[in-house]
C-alpha cells in the first residue's frame, strides 16, 4: 500500500512541478520565483517526508504529555533502540493517528483524484477502524450523526475545534504540493475544517506550508519564516 501511495505521489508531484513555475510565490530575497527539481530528488524528498514523520511520531511517543509547557532538556535520555518503530506499530498501533489520518486522506486522493469532494475524506476516516481522540474523534461522531464538514469541525459542534489534530496530520498537504504553499493551504482549507477551526486549523495550515517550502529551500529559518505568511500574524 505504501509503495502504491508513494508512486501516486511521485507521479502527481512530477506533474505538479510542471506547473510549479506558474505559481507565483510571494517575492522575497530568500525564495526563487521559479524552481526546477529532478524527479529523482523530488521522490527522495517525498520519501524523506514520510520517513521523517514516521520516525518522529515513534521517537516522541515516550515523551507525550510528560513535558507540558516546557522544553525537553538535552540531559533527558530518550530511548530509541533498533527496531523500536516496528515494536511501537506492532504493540501500540493506536498511538499513531498522525500517520493513519494522513494516509487515509492520500488514499482518497489516489482513488478519486485531486478534486475529490470533502465528504469523501470525511466518510473515509469516520468509518475507519482505528481509534481517534479529541477533535478527530468529535468530528467522527459528528459525521456519523449527520453533521458534515465544515460544520463537523466548527466550535459550535466540536468542543475540541482548537486542538492540534489537523496540525499533526497536515503533512500530506505539503508533501503533495511541492513549492506551492498556497495550494497546500487550499487543501487544508477543505480537509482541515473537517475537524478543526481557528488556531486548531491554522497550525495545520502552517505545517503544510512548511512541508511545501522544504522542497525548494534547505534553510530551516527560511522555511519557518516564509510559512508564517500563510496564517494570520496573531494566530
Specify the residue positions occupied by each region the protein language model found.
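N-terminal secretory signal peptides that target proteins for export/translocation
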Residues: 1-2
Amino acid at each position: 500500500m505504501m509503495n502504491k501511495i508513494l508512486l501516486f505521489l511521485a507521479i502527481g508531484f512530477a506533474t505538479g512541478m510542471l506547473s510549479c513555475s506558474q505559481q507565483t510565490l510571494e517575492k522575497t530575497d530568500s525564495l526563487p520565483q521559479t524552481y526546477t527539481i529532478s524527479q529523482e530528488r523530488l521522490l527522495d524528498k517525498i520519501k524523506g517526508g514520510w520517513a521523517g514523520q514516521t520516525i518522529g511520531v515513534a521517537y516522541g511517543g515516550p515523551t507525550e504529555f510528560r513535558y507540558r509547557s516546557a522544553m525537553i532538556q538535552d540531559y533527558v535520555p530518550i530511548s530509541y533502540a533498533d527496531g523500536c518503530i516496528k515494536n511501537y506499530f506492532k504493540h501500540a498501533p493506536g498511538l499513531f493517528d498522525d500517520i493513519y489520518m494522513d494516509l487515509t486522506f492520500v488514499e482518497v486522493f489516489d482513488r478519486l483524484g485531486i478534486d475529490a469532494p470533502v465528504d469523501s475524506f470525511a466518510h473515509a476516516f469516520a468509518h475507519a477502524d482505528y481509534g481517534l481522540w479529541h477533535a478527530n474523534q468529535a468530528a467522527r461522531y459528528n459525521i456519523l450523526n449527520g453533521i458534515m464538514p465544515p460544520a463537523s469541525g466548527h466550535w459550535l459542534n466540536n468542543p475540541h475545534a482548537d486542538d492540534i489534530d489537523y496540525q499533526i496530520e497536515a503533512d500530506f498537504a505539503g508533501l503533495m504540493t511541492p513549492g506551492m504553499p498556497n495550494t497546500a493551504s487550499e487543501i487544508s482549507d477543505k480537509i482541515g475544517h473537517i475537524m478543526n477551526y481557528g488556531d486548531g486549523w491554522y497550525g495545520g495550515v502552517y505545517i503544510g506550508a512548511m512541508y511545501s517550502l522544504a522542497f525548494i529551500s534547505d534553510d530551516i529559518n527560511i522555511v519557518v519564516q516564509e510559512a508564517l505568511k500563510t496564517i494570520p500574524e496573531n494566530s
